[in-house]
Every structure is written in C-alpha cells, then in structure tokens.
C-alpha cells in the first residue's frame, strides 16, 4: 500500500514537471521567434520570455479552473490575451508591437 501511494505521488509530481517543461518550451519558442523578427536585445528578450511564461501559466490555470464552464473560461482567457498585449507593448514599445502585428498578419496570409 505504501508503495502504491508513493508511486501515485511520484506520478503527480512527474506530470507537473513535464507540464512545466512544456510551458517553458512554448515560452522559449515564441520568445525566440519574436526576438528574431524584432531583433530584440538581451534585456527585451528576457522580458518577453517572462511575460510569455506567465501567460502560459495563467492559461493553464484558467483552463483547469473553468474546465466545465466554457462560458466563463472564454472571457477569462480573453482577459489574459489583452493583458499580454499590454505587457508586451509596455516592454517593447508601440513600434515593435506594430512590427510584430504586421509580421503575424503576413504569415497568416501564407
């Protein structure tokens, strides 16, 4: 019985670590893309990474909290994305955010 409980605890811990690694990987991937497109310096890249990681963590939290309530989940996720834009705009400036928006629009056409 003790082994079973220990195994269950280890599985939960492992799943959390894997999920965190996945979020870190997503944040790194999008940060690298933004850095390449906008030619960010090291400080800007660090800020973008932190903003993106927090965004992904918030999204996971909201999806877990409202998994059975799509009507509430949708507006909560929209709030996260609006805050994301504001934080990125504050960190990078209006011109770079416009450049990023233009890039996203362009790749959307392809």
Predicted regions span which residues?
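Bacterial Sec-dependent N-terminal signal peptides
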Residues: 1-24
